[in-house]
Each structure stands twice: as structure tokens, then as C-alpha cells.
């Protein structure tokens, strides 16, 4: 039987109520979180480390799939951290989205945030002119 939240024929308010009732507090918290990932030249994502890891007492990064097992609300800059071509970046983003939908308990897709104000910031993409103070 298909879960109500996955049934596109049901009213939105029913789907939302069903999904929220199924979610643990940890999964709800994960949906409010964003990960800024590093995409290497080979099209593989890894987590970006920063001082927050040090302040949190995290000595080593957990495997990305372990960190994302509860889901995540947003993936930040999935294509733009290193210079990659658009096809490599999109393939990597698709792999990551597939993981979110197939390997998490509820299969909630992530939102992707990429800088595109003057064009997609990746190798061989067109960037349009803009003023210095945009």
C-alpha cells in the first residue's frame, strides 16, 4: 500500500499531515539542515569541513551517507566548489538525489542551492555580464 504522503492524487494537506506524523524529531531536524559539499574533479561528493567540526568536537568526518541517512533539507553548491563541467556536476547531483530518495527511510528529495545569478558557475558554462555591486 502506498503511503498517503507519496500519493499525488491525495490533497496536499493530507499528504503533509501523513508525512509529519511519520517523521521522527531527528528527521524533522535534518530537514532544517543544509550541507555544503565538496565536489571533486572526478564527480564525487564529500563533506566540507570547517571550524564548526572543531567546536563540536568532531575529530573525523563520518561517511557522507551516514550523515545523510536521516535526510537533509538542502545541499549547498553541489556543482560549484571545484571546477567541474556541467555534465559531471549534474551526474554527481543526480547520484546524490537518488541516494536521498532511495536510501533514506522516507525518501524525501533534497533541495539543491547553486549560485546562478549571472549563469551557472561551472566549467565551460556561460556567465553573463553584471555590475560589480549586484
Which role fits each region the language model picked out?
Residues 1-134:
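N-terminal beta-rich core of secreted/periplasmic extracellular enzymes
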